[in-house]
Regions:
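Charged, often low-complexity linker/regulatory segments
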Residues: 1-59
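Surface-exposed beta-strand-to-loop junctions
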Residues: 12-19, 329, 408-412
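Short hinge/gating elements
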Residues: 19-25, 329-337
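Alpha-helix N-cap/helix-initiation sites
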Residues: 27-35, 230, 234, 309-312, ...
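Active-site metal-binding core of divalent-cation-utilizing nuclease and nuclease-like domains
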Residues: 50-77
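Charged, often flexible domain-edge or linker segments that flank or initiate folded functional domains
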Residues: 68-69, 73-289, 335-338, 344-480
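Non-catalytic substrate-recognition/targeting regions of SAM-dependent transferases
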Residues: 267-333
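Carboxylate/His-rich catalytic cores and anion/metal-binding grooves
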Residues: 294-303, 373, 477-484
Length: 484
């Protein structure tokens, strides 16, 4: 006769407590000594209760860069949740749950268990859900005997809630901006900054440090490590966002590289490292998490909502604004990252369009094929995007919509130029123009790109090639910018 659910769980937990006791009785146990016990217990529970493909991964701590100790997968490439463990003698989980470390984890990871291997606290969306003690850890430590098993049914309820968790589909811009911002903040402060500090001290691979040196040597020679951590974290998040707008139904870290356009060489190189090579484990974990968030997001619906909620006609830049306000409002204010009001942009661009007609003999204004434009400090391409809209509007008004494809291919793509120094707005700008052109029925081919280049217009010399990562791509971008 098969065991009931409760009897089976009792069997699993009895074996689990026995394994914990063996570790304790050896007398030399560290926190990591107990990891295999909880991994086996959770996987046994999952197998017995309808979560057959679930897998518990122990996250290595090669550096101080901080993710929780375990990650749980649903067996279908999606993340179920995370687990942070403390030694059994740490009996005050309530005080631990209010520590700075746990606050960061609770803010970043939506389904989290805190445990000392005997007591388990479940947090979802940062809020305490329930806590269950299955045995007394102090009795196990002091008596050297396995303590009595308790609260089996309550523990079953806790684990069932944990394993049943799945991220809801995100359909509104504010929720997505918040979900991405808190993870990007964690990526910047708890992963990239710490990994860079570790790489400076050790003789290891120093991959992130070499990326930093590339940007400092070839683009921004006063770039600090803190600024690079911010630049790199934002670039990763927006790069994943770009890839998601181009992806099919499936989406994960390994697929990001596939969906970055070949013409964006710098971004492509960054994600070759992330998707196809061996990034630091802590970094890979966070990228998996961000990819999981975007997998559960209807990107096109969110971008469309910016049009319908009175946000104006530029959904990409408004998403950028919303993200920055969630990510780091002080940084946004310090850098002056505020978009020029759209009525002002329209007035300036349409005034230029009118002057081209009235004073320079260009009958089609910005749509005239011998007109070239350049924005040397383009930001997120607010002005070039408006110029494109005006040119298409002029062309459609005179010649109909049938030849707009030709206008884009033979005038806008070769004659509209922009240069930007910072990687995040550069990435957002490319996304914006791709979206704008698609709205007019033009999909960029793999060989095409809008002529927005990453370069320093105040130091226009093409940087010398070096062996540093992405040096070739940065040098190529700067050379193309210099030709303009």
């Amino acid at each position: 006769m098969p065991l009931s659910r409760g009897e089976l769980l009792k069997q699993i937990l009895t074996r689990y407590l026995s394994e914990l006791q063996k570790v304790i009785n050896r007398g030399d146990a560290r926190e990591e000594s107990f990891y295999h016990c909880v991994k086996e217990m959770l996987e046994s529970y999952a197998q017995a209760n309808g979560f057959r493909r679930s897998e518990v991964s122990i996250l290595p701590k090669a550096t101080e860069a901080g993710n929780p100790d375990f990650r749980v997968w649903d067996g279908k490439t999606r993340i179920t949740g995370y687990i942070e463990a403390k030694k059994p003698e740490v009996s005050q989980l309530e005080s631990i749950s209010e520590s700075e470390q746990l606050k960061r984890y609770r803010d970043t990871f939506d389904n989290l268990i805190l445990t000392n291997f005997y007591e388990f606290w479940l947090f979802q969306y940062g809020k305490f859900v329930c806590g269950v003690t299955i045995a007394d850890p102090l009795e196990a430590i002091h008596s050297q005997k396995k303590p009595p098993l308790t609260n089996i049914e309550d523990f079953d309820t806790l684990l069932d809630r944990y394993f049943s968790f799945s991220l809801p589909a995100i359909t509104d811009p504010k929720s997505l901006a918040n979900a991405l911002a808190k993870r990007t903040r964690f990526l910047r402060d708890e992963i990239i900054t710490i990994e860079l500090a570790e790489e400076e001290k050790t003789q290891g691979r120093k991959v992130l440090l070499k990326f930093y040196e590339s940007f400092k040597k070839l683009l921004i020679n006063n770039l600090t490590i803190e600024q690079f951590a911010d630049l790199y974290a934002q670039t990763l998040t927006y790069g994943i966002f770009v890839a998601r707008t181009r992806s099919g139904e499936d989406f994960n870290r390994e697929l990001i590289y596939k969906y970055i356009p070949n013409t964006l060489g710098i971004l492509k190189s960054i994600f070759r490292f992330i998707s196809l090579e061996e990034p630091p484990q802590a970094l890979a974990v966070l990228i998996d998490d961000i990819a999981d968030i975007l997998f559960n997001t209807d990107i096109q619906k969110i971008l469309h909502r910016f049009y319908t909620e009175g946000k104006g006609r530029d959904p990409i830049v408004h998403f950028y604004e919303t993200f920055l306000s969630e990510y780091d409002p002080k940084l946004r204010e310090k850098r002056g990252v505020y978009y020029t009001p759209e009525p002002v942009v329209r007035y300036i661009v349409r005034s230029i369009h009118s002057l081209l007609k009235s004073h320079f003999g260009k009958d089609d204004g910005l749509a005239s094929e011998d007109v070239t434009i350049l924005d040397p400090a383009a930001g997120t391409l607010t002005f070039p995007a408006e110029a494109i809209k005006v040119a298409i509007e002029e062309h459609e008004g005179k010649y109909g919509s049938g030849s707009v494809h030709k206008l884009i291919k033979h005038h806008i793509l070769p004659h509209f130029h922009a240069i930007e120094l910072m990687m995040a707005p550069y990435t957002v700008g490319h996304l914006k123009i791709s979206y704008l052109l698609a709205e007019h029925g033009y999909e960029l081919s793999e060989a095409e790109r809008f002529k927005l280049y990453l370069s320093n217009t105040l130091e226009p010399d093409t940087p010398q090639q070096t062996e540093l990562p992405i040096a070739h791509d940065i040098s190529e971008e700067c050379a193309l910018a210099n030709k303009v």
